Amino acid sequence: VKLWVVAALMLAGCSPSAAPGDESATLEQAAIARGVVRNPAATTPIGLYAREGDRLCIAGDRIGMFVDYGDDIGCSGRGTFTRDGEALRIDLGNGCAFEAAFDGDHIRLPGALPATCKRLCTRRASLAGFEVNRLSESGSEAAALRDPKGRQLCG
């Protein structure tokens, strides 16, 4: 009997197990199917996004963003983007190009950006780690966004 138990345990140890990434992918697919979360593949990024004093607009192939910490400390940039699945390839000009994550309702910039992006900021401000949530899917609202100095970012 002991030999049978040992053989059964060894055989069970050889059976394939689900990889951790598989489980999270399955959970995400189930949430999308039930409408709990938005399907990023079926969602256009066009619209207006915000979080505290940060704003981002997407209208057509144009993208603009700003952060405003007050006391003339902030960042402001505008440029173009292309979409590649759940990634937005953003080009704000003069070598400031990077990839941001898009999940259908949120846009998140990487924690490290090219040094050339620093020109978009004053004093110690940075766009690194910039993260915003969707407020509107309206292209016209996005096109109307202006930075704190009155510059139109997506129009």
Model-found features: residue ranges?
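C-terminal partner/receptor-binding element of secreted or periplasmic proteins
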Residues: T116-G155
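Sec-dependent bacterial lipoprotein signal peptides
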Residues: V1-A12
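Bacterial signal peptide processing site
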Residues: C14-S17
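N-terminal glycine/threonine-rich, aromatic-flanked beta-hairpin/loop signature
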Residues: R51-R89, L153
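Low-complexity, Pro/Thr/Ser/Glu-rich flexible segments characteristic
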Residues: P20-R38
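A composition-driven surface/loop motif
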Residues: E23-S24, E28-Q29, T44-A50, G64, ...
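N-terminal helix-cap/turn-to-beta initiation motif at the start of protein domains
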Residues: I32-A50, C57-A59, P148-L153
